[in-house]
Amino acid sequence: MAARGAMLRYLRVNVNPTIQNPRECVLPFSILLRRFSEEVRGSFLDKSEVTDRVLSVVKNFQKVDPSKVTPKANFQNDLGLDSLDSVEVVMALEEEFGFEIPDNEADKIQSIDLAVDFIASHPQAK
């Protein structure tokens, strides 16, 4: 026991803080909250822009009749797409907006308005 204590005293290194007053370098939480919330708030796309881009992607999909594409159109009922076609549309939307839609969310996107709502509320959409 005595040898252990002597060894620890011998190996102990003094550390001096480089900051004179640590409280001076800490930002108040309200400043951090404001800074980060402004970044997130400013990064969402405008819903009308998202709608136009989604409509354009769906109209350019080869299995869709462009005259049937409306903001409320359902992929299966109105546009006649099967589940595999719907997956391809979602993949095209991922490419258009530059982010990956998780599988569990992609399964829920069955219409143009659902796609617009999801993309407009996603902070990574470009």
From Swiss-Prot:
Transit peptide, UniProt annotation: 1-36
Pathway: Lipid metabolism; fatty acid biosynthesis
InterPro entries: ACP, ACP-like_sf, PP-bd_ACP, Ppantetheine_attach_site
Any GO MF annotation of the entry: cobalt ion binding
In-chain residues carrying the UniProt-annotated modification O-(pantetheine 4'-phosphoryl)serine: 83
Family stated for the protein in its record: Belongs to the acyl carrier protein (ACP) family.
Localization: Mitochondrion
BP GO terms, sorted: mitochondrial electron transport, NADH to ubiquinone; proton transmembrane transport
SUPFAM superfamilies: ACP-like
Record note on quaternary structure: Complex I is composed of at least 49 different subunits.
Function, in words: Carrier of the growing fatty acid chain in fatty acid biosynthesis. May be involved in the synthesis of short and medium chain fatty acids. Accessory and non-catalytic subunit of the mitochondrial membrane respiratory chain NADH dehydrogenase (Complex I), which functions in the transfer of electrons from NADH to the respiratory chain.
Protein name (database record): Acyl carrier protein 2, mitochondrial
Source organism phylogeny: Eukaryota, Viridiplantae, Streptophyta, Embryophyta, Tracheophyta
Gene encoding the protein: MTACP2
Keywords: Electron transport, Fatty acid biosynthesis, Fatty acid metabolism, Lipid biosynthesis, Lipid metabolism, Mitochondrion, Phosphopantetheine, Phosphoprotein, Respiratory chain, Transit peptide, Transport
Domain named Carrier: residues: 48-123
PTM note: 4'-phosphopantetheine is transferred from CoA to a specific serine of the apo-ACP-like protein.
GO annotations of cellular component type: cytosol; mitochondrial matrix; mitochondrion; nucleus
Pfam families xref list: PP-binding
